[in-house]
From Swiss-Prot:
Database matches in SUPFAM superfamilies: Translation proteins SH3-like domain
GO CC annotation terms, alphabetical: ribonucleoprotein complex; ribosome
Recorded name of the encoding gene: rplX
Originating species: Desulfitobacterium hafniense (strain Y51)
A Pfam entry, by short name: KOW
Protein's job: One of two assembly initiator proteins, it binds directly to the 5'-end of the 23S rRNA, where it nucleates assembly of the 50S subunit. One of the proteins that surrounds the polypeptide exit tunnel on the outside of the subunit.
Protein name as it appears in the record: Large ribosomal subunit protein uL24
Length: 112
């Protein structure tokens, strides 16, 4: 069965907070988004250890730490203006559509 592309409520560059799981309460910036899998990679969240054999490209080998993807349903957008997690509404303006914080009404920055 083919994966269905899921509509994501967060974008690359957004500030988010993890609301469930072992990293609940941690904040970070979204580094990567995988809409087909419904997962996101967040800076300094869900760190896993990767054991690498020595190879020509990496002669040292060893154990490296990196961020692993987590389900996008486990994160919520974090508004830096009101310092709270929030849901997003979309407002139509002359310039186009903008994302707005539901708690304080401030336009959320578009990180492109």
């Amino acid at each position: 069965m083919a994966a269905v592309k899921q509509k994501m409520h967060v974008k690359k560059g957004d500030m988010v907070m993890v609301i469930t799981g072992k990293d609940a309460g941690k904040k970070g910036k979204v580094l990567e988004v995988f809409p087909k899998k419904g997962r996101v990679v967040i800076e300094k969240v869900n760190i896993v250890k990767r054991h690498t054999k020595p190879s020509q490209s990496m002669p040292q080998g060893g154990i490296f730490e990196k961020e692993a993807p987590i389900a996008s349903s486990n994160v919520m957008l974090y508004c830096t203006e009101c310092n709270k997690v929030t849901r997003v509404s979309v407002k139509e303006t002359e310039a186009g559509k903008v994302r707005v914080c539901k708690k304080c009404g401030v336009n959320l920055p578009d990180k492109k």
